[in-house]
Amino acid sequence: MSRPDSVNVAEAKAVIAGKEIKSQQLLKLVAELKKERVFGLARKALEKHQADYLNKRISIPSQTDKRKLTQQLSLCTYKDPDLNPTDKLDSALDFLKGLDSLDLKSNDCTKDQETLSQAGAIFKRKWELTSQTAYLETSLAYYARLYVNRSG
């Protein structure tokens, strides 16, 4: 016999089925789902919310909320155990590229700590999957940029 869904899982399923939710509420729900390690469901709820505001079914979130939602979508995508490992890392990176420049050779490269941290983690996982040294070097470069930005 399977155990019943948690309140958070039930809420996420309702969002996926079409229940409207405000961006701030969704961010709180995603935080709880991550604690429960239900990354796939969190990802699907974030994707549904994103599709709803892109298709103008709900109001567009503030720029700050949109950034946080996209960062959480990236995180939940690359941590979702049900997705193909290579594809999920590429998708997560694409979400981040939609927010900011990730070009380490450019002065326009993001200074956003969460984005840099996730980019470093994604490239580290790419290295773990492929053993390609270039991925590890790129990961370290993102973490170095993060360190420099924090140090000021």
Outline where the language-model segments fall.
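Short Lys/Arg-enriched alpha/beta "domain-start" segment
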Residues: S2-P4
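Amphipathic alpha-helical repeat scaffolds of TPR domains
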Residues: S6-E47, K56-L83, D108-L129, S151-G152
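Generic detector of contiguous secondary-structure segments
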Residues: Y78, L96-T110, L146-R150
